[in-house]
Regions:
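Beta-lactam-recognizing serine transpeptidase/beta-lactamase-like catalytic domain environment
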Residues: 1-53, 58-188
C-alpha cells in the first residue's frame, strides 16, 4: 500500500532520501513530524471518496435485514425519481423497466435503490451505515486515517437519503470498503 515510490518499508523513519544531514539536524521536531507524515501519506488511508455503486449491496443487505424489502420484491425503473422537488436520474436515463432485486444489483440501478432507501427511511438507514462502521476508522496501523464524512439525522433529508443509497454524497476510504466484503467472502 505504499504510494510513495521512494518509501522504504524496512526503514520508515529514514528521511535521508529527501533531506541532507545538515537539513535533518536543523529541523524542529514538528518539522520532522511533518516530513514523516508526508512520507507516510497513503491515499487509500487518508483520502476519502464517494463509494458509488460498490455501496449498493450494503444497502440491499441492510434493507433485507430490517425487513424493509424481501428477496422477491420487484421494482420499476423509469429512469429516475422525483424526491421532494428534485429529479434524480438513474444512470440509465431511459430506465431499466421491471426489475427483480437481483436485477437491481446486476443493472446497478439508482432508481430502484432510491425506492429501497425510501422504504428503509432515514433513521434506520443511518443506523445501518453506522453498523457497517462507515464514518469510523478501520484501526489500520498507518497514520492519518480518514473516517470519511456521513450525514447525521439533523442534516439528512429525503434527497440525501436517495443519493446515499447509491453511494453518493457521503465519503469513505479505500481501506474501509473492502472490509465489509472480506468478512463475508472469507466464510466461503
Amino acid at each position: 500500500m505504499a504510494s510513495n515510490h521512494g518509501f522504504d518499508l524496512t526503514d520508515p523513519d529514514d528521511l535521508s532520501d529527501k533531506y541532507t544531514d545538515a537539513e535533518l539536524k536543523s529541523m524542529t521536531e514538528e518539522e520532522k513530524s511533518d516530513a514523516l507524515n508526508e512520507k507516510w501519506y497513503n491515499y487509500c488511508v487518508s483520502e476519502s471518496f464517494e463509494p458509488g455503486s460498490t455501496f449498493k449491496p450494503i444497502v440491499v443487505a441492510s434493507a433485507l435485514e430490517m425487513g424493509a424489502i424481501t428477496t422477491d420484491a420487484t421494482y420499476v425503473c423509469d429512469g429516475g425519481e422525483f424526491v421532494t422537488d428534485t429529479e434524480i436520474k438513474c444512470d440509465n436515463i431511459y430506465g431499466h423497466g421491471d426489475e427483480t432485486l437481483s436485477d437491481v444489483i446486476k443493472n446497478s440501478c439508482n432508481d430502484a435503490m432510491m425506492q429501497i432507501g425510501m422504504k428503509m427511511q432515514i433513521t434506520p438507514f443511518l443506523k445501518y451505515q453506522r453498523l457497517f462502521n462507515f464514518g469510523s476508522r478501520t484501526g489500520i496501523d498507518l497514520p492519518n486515517e480518514s473516517t470519511g464524512v456521513l450525514y447525521d439525522r439533523d442534516s439528512m433529508h429525503e434527497v440525501e437519503l436517495a443519493t446515499n443509497t447509491f453511494g453518493q454524497t457521503f465519503t469513505s476510504t479505500k481501506c474501509r470498503l473492502p472490509l465489509h466484503y472480506m468478512r463475508h467472502l472469507m466464510q466461503w
